[in-house]
């Protein structure tokens, strides 16, 4: 019931909301990395357990590079540690996002393709698809089950006055096991606390903060499409632009179904290297 009420509330709000870029944890909008810039980010997902489950910590690092104004690539490295169990490396991901349209429109599509070389101990939950995973399996067993997966997303994003509104539709295929196609979604809305600069140089001015909310979850698979045995989360998100290079993010996600974790706490720190591509080109005697 909570899930249905949240879905209805978000759908009712979307037509009335008014957009700007906001870095969500799960939802993607249409803004890509600036060409030649490299952003390095470390993020952590903390899973608060139900009775009989164990607390886990799932850190990951991401390296995002703006190849062109309409193409961004990212490499992810991830791990996981479970209380009373062990810490394991859970794999890597290589992601590419493409903007087919050069200009900005009322609705801006982005095409997303990702290859994942991970194992079943992965807990970063960068997306939620299919049915809810079994998080009670020991790391020694889960880490031995490897998966090669292809994930695609259709990202639709709009900027309306001071609001960003984004919708992601996810399809994932496990190439290692016959699980059919798995489906998921992510919806997000966000805005800055202030749109006009105060004129003062300060770290805590309102224009340095973006706030918003995400709703994301799984939609089953071709073997059984729908909400049965799926995880769904509603998550406020706050982003603090500390400087031109540094930003901090935080999001407490609330599980909406029994199959979800009761709470997911997410933290992120990112540092952006402006003009990284040009500097590397100069180092090797090439053109920036």
Region spans (language model):
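Bacterial N-terminal signal peptides
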Residues: 4-14
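Transmembrane beta-barrel domains of Gram-negative outer membranes and organellar outer membranes
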Residues: 19-288
